[in-house]
Amino acid sequence: MERGSKVKILRKESYWYQEIGTVAAIDKSGIKYPVLVRFEKVNYNNVNTNSFADTELINLGK
């Protein structure tokens, strides 16, 4: 997984569950949710990004 990769969200409580987003950044410092994902649509707070753990994502490639 790298910046620009398409990913599918597996976190059930997420607004974007089962949606496809694009990896915007990956933090290598050891935090719990290091992968920042950007989406086409916004959530109820008008936000289009969220952080996820590697285990909550399926990498679909570029």
Curated annotation (Swiss-Prot):
Pfam families: PSI_PsaE. It is a peripheral membrane protein. Keywords: Chloroplast, Membrane, Photosynthesis, Photosystem I, Plastid, Thylakoid. It is found in: Plastid, Chloroplast thylakoid membrane. GO terms for biological process: photosynthesis. GO terms for cellular component: chloroplast thylakoid membrane; photosystem I reaction center. Belongs to the PsaE family. Stabilizes the interaction between PsaC and the PSI core, assists the docking of the ferredoxin to PSI and interacts with ferredoxin-NADP oxidoreductase. This is Photosystem I reaction center subunit IV. It comes from Pyropia yezoensis (Susabi-nori). The lineage of its organism: Eukaryota, Rhodophyta, Bangiophyceae, Bangiales, Bangiaceae. The gene is psaE.
